[in-house]
């Protein structure tokens, strides 16, 4: 009888253990189902959320950056109106308009701001305090105070750098090769723009190296730019050389038209300006810059922090020459320079 009782006890313990194990399995299964349901709900909510992106550019060729941004977002599967809304502001080269737009965006609590050019990014950074900022700038973002380093931005800003200021000397060298008799070059820039002042210093340095006289004119507004260009006298300069200044570049069509009327060859940093009638450019494609920036917008939309997103550098440079413009101003481009061009507009 003792054996029978002991056997019953053992069987009871075994049954309890099996029951407990079975209960634990059900609990674990339930936890997995709940977790999957929550994750699915979060994913669905994230997909259904429409993100609002404030975009600020300074007009003219900088619109190509915004076009590239839209192209890049589409390539990433993000549709305007379905996944995000872009509120685009064109400041027409005026910093005050950039500041006003940035303040509007922060008041409206957009999810992030995309700023094009160094001066625009500086203005946006200065008048906002919390919104993540994705930039596309032509100068060193570390030296400009936007990020702590390229690898670890460390704040609320990150984005793409395209070399504009760094290529000042190279563009001047190419202009000299295109115009062997070149001796006087006019540059017009805003003396209140730190990036432009640095670019002017580099142009001066390169000018001495190539035996060129730089004629410097200052303009702090679009009206002043028009006045300075209009005041240029015949044969006062042999060519117009564009340096890194967002306000001047934003008025590229004005500059091109006035230069052409004075039969002045022009050298720019952005390719689209050559298709607009400029003589030549050496630098990056703004549309490509915008496409690269789209990756940062997408990553921040899905939870990444700007401080953790490495700044990307665009390092592909192309020489573009417009032979239609050369003919219009009575200029013959040396064959050796034409042979080096990545693209020739005929």
Where are these regions (language model features)?
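Short hydrophobic alpha-helices and adjacent helix-cap/hinge residues
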Residues: 1-346
């Amino acid at each position: 009888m003792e054996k029978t009782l002991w056997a019953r006890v053992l069987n009871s313990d075994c049954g309890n253990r099996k029951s407990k194990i079975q209960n634990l399995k059900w609990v674990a299964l339930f936890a997995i189902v709940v977790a999957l349901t929550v994750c699915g709900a979060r994913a669905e909510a994230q997909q259904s959320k429409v993100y609002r992106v404030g975009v600020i550019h300074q007009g003219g060729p900088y619109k190509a950056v915004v076009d590239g941004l839209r192209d890049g977002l589409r390539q990433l599967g993000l549709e305007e109106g379905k996944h995000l809304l872009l509120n685009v502001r064109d400041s027409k080269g005026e910093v005050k308009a950039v500041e006003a737009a940035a303040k509007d965006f922060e008041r409206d609590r957009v999810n992030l701001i995309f700023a094009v050019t160094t001066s625009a990014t500086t203005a946006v950074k200065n008048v906002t305090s919390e919104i993540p900022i994705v930039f596309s700038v032509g100068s060193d973002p570390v030296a400009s105070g936007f990020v702590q380093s390229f690898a670890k931005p460390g704040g609320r800003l990150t984005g793409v750098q395209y070399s504009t200021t760094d290529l000042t000397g190279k563009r001047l060298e190419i202009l000299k090769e295109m115009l062997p008799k070149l001796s006087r070059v006019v540059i017009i820039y805003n003396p209140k723009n730190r990036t432009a002042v640095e670019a002017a210093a580099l142009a001066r340095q390169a000018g001495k190296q190539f035996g060129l006289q730089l004629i410097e004119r200052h303009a702090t507004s679009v009206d002043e730019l028009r006045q300075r260009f209009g005041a240029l006298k015949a044969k006062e300069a042999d060519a117009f050389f564009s340096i890194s200044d967002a306000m001047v570049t934003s008025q590229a069509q004005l500059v091109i038209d006035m230069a052409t009327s004075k039969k002045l060859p022009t050298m720019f940093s952005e390719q689209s300006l050559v298709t607009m009638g400029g003589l030549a450019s050496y630098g990056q494609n703004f549309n490509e810059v915008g496409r690269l920036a789209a990756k940062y917008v997408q990553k921040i939309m899905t939870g990444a922090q700007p401080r953790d997103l490495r700044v990307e550098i665009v390092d592909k440079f192309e020489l573009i020459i417009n032979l239609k413009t050369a003919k219009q101003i009575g200029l013959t481009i040396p064959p050796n320079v034409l042979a080096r061009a990545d693209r020739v507009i005929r």
